[in-house]
């Protein structure tokens, strides 16, 4: 169990009009912030949690509350993993009618977390009314994101390497309402430790043109971004030697 509470005093500013007349205005009212966290550890490194954040402001301005339930489960061998998050945001006393705006967000994932072959499938969703900016980091809402990770590793040493890792990543994003393409990306990575304990790796990736619906800040418009193809090669000298060296080559091609 965790609980945090903080209180901030009202804040004021002196403003002056064109006639040099000054007046004192309230820029931020008396405000109370609190966070409540309930967490229960379960067998097999599993857990469930409930988090609630609340911001109360005195006077006629709005108040905000966000509640989220999280869960993460593993099987007995810690080989398979699934979990997620369901959250709801409420902004109270907004507008002339003092209505409540309720938003919704969810996240679900499933994967294999041990063994030579591993993978993870993830989906995140947020409607256009979900808002956590009163207490927390907030970028944007109204999206549906899907991602897939697949990896394969060779941990048994051979004649030329000690270990080798290969992974594939893909990402696809849409605006939820109205449903429109936002962005996508795909890349493949390989990393290895050689017999002389040097490390080396390579990566190739591609991102098609994307649509940024937030950048124009004008309803009905969007920013069309470029498509990108890129690659990376790197070699790192053995770290335990007196001198360390790292060579990194990166290629990027962008076009509209």
Region spans (language model):
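Conserved structural-core and active-site-/substrate-pathway-adjacent residues in large, well-folded domains
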Residues: 1-3, 38, 68-71, 121, ...
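Exposed, low-structure sequence patches enriched in small/polar residues
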Residues: 62-64, 77-256
């Amino acid at each position: 169990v965790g609980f945090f509470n903080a209180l901030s005093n009202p804040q004021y500013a002196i403003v002056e009009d064109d006639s040099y007349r000054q007046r004192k205005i309230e820029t931020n009212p008396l405000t109370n912030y609190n966070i409540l966290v309930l967490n229960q550890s379960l067998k097999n490194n599993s857990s469930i949690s409930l988090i609630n954040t609340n911001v109360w402001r005195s006077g006629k301005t709005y108040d905000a509350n966000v509640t989220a339930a999280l869960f993460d489960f593993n099987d007995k061998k810690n080989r398979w993993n699934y979990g997620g998050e369901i959250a709801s945001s409420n902004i109270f006393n907004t507008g002339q009618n003092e209505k409540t705006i309720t938003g919704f967000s969810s996240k679900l994932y499933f994967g294999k977390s041990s063994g030579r072959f591993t993978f993870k499938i993830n989906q995140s969703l947020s409607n256009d009314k979900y808002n956590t900016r009163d207490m927390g980091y907030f970028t944007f809402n109204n999206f549906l994101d899907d991602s897939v990770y697949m990896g394969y590793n060779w941990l048994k040493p051979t004649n030329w390497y000690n270990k080798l890792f290969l992974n594939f990543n893909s990402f696809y994003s849409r605006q939820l309402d109205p449903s429109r393409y936002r962005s996508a990306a795909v890349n493949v990575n390989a990393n290895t430790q050689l017999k002389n304990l040097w490390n080396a790796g390579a990566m190739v990736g591609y991102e098609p043109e994307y649509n940024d619906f937030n950048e124009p800040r004008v309803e009905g418009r969007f920013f069309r971004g470029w498509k990108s193809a890129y690659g990376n090669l790197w070699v790192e000298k053995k770290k335990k030697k007196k001198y360390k060296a790292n060579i990194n080559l990166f290629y990027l091609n962008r076009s509209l």
